[in-house]
């Protein structure tokens, strides 16, 4: 059983922002999870089921992550990412484009921790401010204006902090555990913008240096794209980051906008993809699969960021409660400034990467 990455594998992880561990989860754990999924009642949420959480807690993923990252709370729940086979659709996606028009099997490459409300399915009318107000008033809490109390349909707050200086939730690492054959593109696999974690870190640092407002609605990152076909698309990645990954392989939507080509992560049941929080990613349309795409997604945070707060394994905004509740922190503990520090220093929470990070940075200099 593999219990850690080799030095060369860590270099690859540093360069790419992700690494696929083949056979990280034993066949019996894979089978137990699949069996539990088959027996699920319609609408049953399987996230807290032991058959799901064991994919990390009882597999080699735990020792690998403990060595690579450091101590973390064992997940008590997870995201069950199941995508049925579908054809390209007419509906507007969260970026404000029709699903059928998005390249790369409908990829909507994004950073986690960002509020998402159901995309308007009609072209929006009015001024930009009117569109903004109407969109955020359509969320589950109604019209609260621009406020950290505003919640998305994904139960992520508009802002993490009361002062509205942090527009993204954050954590340390993703683990995507594969339970279906995703060895061929077009089967709904997770895709990642390879190497973009470095650009994202630099962008956060730039925002910090300008006015210490990080994420959407900070410098250089508007919340909404009013030029999208429905006039109300979410800006999931700032243009400054996106444009660094436009090249001759980039495909365009009908309006001529080019989109960075993400890497489709090809995996087989039992494989696990480890990725940094900073790595932009997306699910894709399961257009060519022979079965539903099944990825079980975990979000882990190094314990040193908040030793007294338990992270449940699924939340992308653990400085707030799962449903956006305000958490209690001891005096002198500013959780949002701690998270900003981690966002601007992406390797701070990767204990097992320090030697490689020092080596790679010395080469760059």
Language model region names:
Residues 2-16, 25-269, 285-291, 298, ...:
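Non-heme Fe(II) oxygenase catalytic core, chiefly the N-lobe of the double-stranded beta-helix
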